[in-house]
Amino acid sequence: MPLQYQSGFGNDWATEALPGALPAGRNSPQRCPYGLYAEQLSGTAFTAPRAENRRSWLYRIRPAAQHRPFEPFDGAARWLSDFGAAPVTPNQLRWSPLPLPDAPTDFIEGVQTWGGNGGPGEHGGVGIHLYAANRSMQGRYFYNADGELLIVPQQGRLRLATELGIIEVEPLEIAVIPRGVRLRVDLPDGQARGYMLENFGAALHLPELGPIGSNCLANARDFQTPVACYEDIEGDFELIAKFTGGFWRAAIGHSPLDVVAWHGTHAPYKYDLRHFNTIGSISFDHPDPSIFTVLTSPSDTPGTANMDFAIFPPRVLAMENTFRPPWFHRNVASEFMGLIHGVYDAKAEGFAPGGASLHNCMSGHGPDADTFEKATAADTSQAHYIRDTMAFMFETRRVIRPTAQALASAQLQSDYYECWQGLNKHFDPAQP
């Protein structure tokens, strides 16, 4: 049976897998229907402003506290939160796609950290990861106490069985798992690869639209949150926790995905990037890439995000007498890019689906020589249709510190800088 979802963003949801499982008129009755336990999951402080407050009430078969003591877990050794172990270079960096594993590897085992900043203790910054896996999580569940997860599949579907219901995402869709939500990751296609951002800061929001108006970019109605769905199974399972940068394991005698009903605002969701309503210039110039923002994590500085997630989807370029590709740039923010599908319009070669690039604070970047020559000779009286593409960017206010494993990776392209060396000198003071 097809999975069911609730439509909207930031709603106060209410859903039950059994009729009457949600208590009427109160959150914590003396006795819950069906003999369930009431439990609140708080994603923000109790006193956070109402518009920012994130919490959900769960009605579950057993409380989340019921498990054996945690002990250290070493099965996620490549998922890191220490971003100060390797020196930071101002060089532009690019990587080829991560290969799929040969040995059996589930999602938790297959995460590899490529860089980040801040950390769980700062309640700010991000971790940037790649993942490659070839088996579903077996007898294992996971939650992240350090931050929310933004998952960007590039190859293969993910079935995210969470406490609050089931989400299935495919390439060109994204999923967000809030801080603390327990889940199991299954691979319907047998293997999967993609990108993941770990947000240590404020929860992701839709960006303000300002003069754009009340519509466009990612519209709230296109986000989907799961309906209640529970597992009532007993056995020898393990619960993996990411806590203050480390990983911990606890034995648990039942599935923790046993929430029969829930209501609230702290919940996972998915979004189809193909629904993004792209905005662009219909006169001249290429606008700033902020017009492509899907989600943003605000910081304590107005107008400056902890992190932005932007995409570069299929679109029509109609600007006349304009250099249409993304322009040459140096940015106070740091930019990590990935390619989900197709070709990125600023790079003719070398940036493949599943690959990644990093342009840190004030490191010059922009179109390669081939792209520049073609764009400066193009007929801009005709519209240009970019159809076969889906690139994305994680942009952060802080420098992204690459990990030692990213810098030592066989996928690192040591010749990336060469893509700009072919840019010719055209300056002639006698020819305005």
Curated annotation (Swiss-Prot):
Disulfide bonds: none annotated. Belongs to the homogentisate dioxygenase family. GO terms for biological process: L-phenylalanine catabolic process; tyrosine catabolic process. Its EC number is 1.13.11.5. Its cofactor is Fe cation. It catalyses: homogentisate + O2 = 4-maleylacetoacetate + H(+). Homogentisate binds at Y344, H365. Fe cation binds at H329, E335, H365. HAMAP family: Homogentis_dioxygen. InterPro entries: HgmA_C, HgmA_N, Homogentis_dOase, Homogentis_dOase_bac, RmlC-like_jellyroll, RmlC_Cupin_sf. The lineage of its organism: Bacteria, Pseudomonadati, Pseudomonadota, Betaproteobacteria, Burkholderiales. Pathway: Amino-acid degradation; L-phenylalanine degradation; acetoacetate and fumarate from L-phenylalanine: step 4/6. It is an enzyme of class 1 (oxidoreductase). One of its GO terms (molecular function) is iron ion binding. It holds the Pfam family HgmA_C. It comes from the Bacteria. Hexamer; dimer of trimers. SUPFAM superfamilies: RmlC-like cupins. GO terms for cellular component: cytoplasm. Keywords: Dioxygenase, Iron, Metal-binding, Oxidoreductase, Phenylalanine catabolism, Tyrosine catabolism. The active site is at H286. Involved in the catabolism of homogentisate (2,5-dihydroxyphenylacetate or 2,5-OH-PhAc), a central intermediate in the degradation of phenylalanine and tyrosine. Catalyzes the oxidative ring cleavage of the aromatic ring of homogentisate to yield maleylacetoacetate. This is Homogentisate 1,2-dioxygenase.
